[in-house]
């Protein structure tokens, strides 16, 4: 998996591919934190919308991430349902950055799932409980950030809609992803003293 280190507006930062899903993401995130002392992790990726008002191309800031993965149960056991959440400073800064640049942004809860094609999951119930979108990594990001006292945030561009069946075309993907990545870069570099 490729990773790069460079500068943005004079500030040093790294970009790292993490693969797909919680197991792959967990390996890369853990090694970044433990081996390289990374203290701020921002995931940029895609998600599938689960609310009618969330549209293709919208940016979703994951405030918290439920999961069907055994990740949390393996750490806490069956008695505790740990709620993995974003770092508030990152979330607040990214939200304001997105709004100020005219992006259509939504902040709220998502779900990170283990299977891309999952016919058993009750999407209607998740929608009724206000879940905005689905991805496959954010719960791991927030859980590992909490475990290792790092900061975590996921910015996700809606590429597919689970309710309407819509999919982003190539132009929407390119433009939307660029806007999301710029928001992430501006967020990280705007915070003074953030490692």
Regions found by a protein language model. Give the residues of each.
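Metabolite-binding pocket within alpha/beta catalytic cores that recognizes anionic/polar moieties
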Residues: 1-84, 88-92
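Short glycine/serine/threonine-rich phosphate/pyrophosphate-binding segments
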Residues: 23-26, 136-141
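Short glycine-aspartate micro-motif
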Residues: 39-43, 133-135, 152
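Active-site rim beta-loop-alpha module in soluble metabolic enzymes
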Residues: 80-129
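Generic non-transmembrane alpha-helical segments
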Residues: 93-101, 144, 183-194
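Zn-dependent metallopeptidase/amidohydrolase metal-coordination segment
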Residues: 139-173
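His/Asp/Glu-rich mid-to-C-terminal helical/loop segments that flank catalytic regions of hydrolases
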Residues: 162-195
